[in-house]
Amino acid sequence: MENCIFCKIIKGEIPSKKVYEDDDVFAFHDLHPVAPVHFMLIPKLHIASLDNVEEKHRDLLGKIVLLAPKLAKEQGCTDGFRTIINTG
């Protein structure tokens, strides 16, 4: 999407500090962190909101959920971490 900040980050139009990237997913440190380790894990496919999720997105969202603890541990969160999903 033209005005989507996340799409611009994925395309490299807005600089970010990458944590992880594959064909489907992009993870980067939050531009305004509120914790010592604060990164965002987003699909490369533009999905504007959880309100727009469909059955066809099941595998992609599952991949993101499975990546979250792996990346958190790699970033030093060995004693637990908080996962937040913002909608809208």
Regions found by a protein language model. Name each.
Residues 1-88:
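HIT superfamily nucleotide-processing domains
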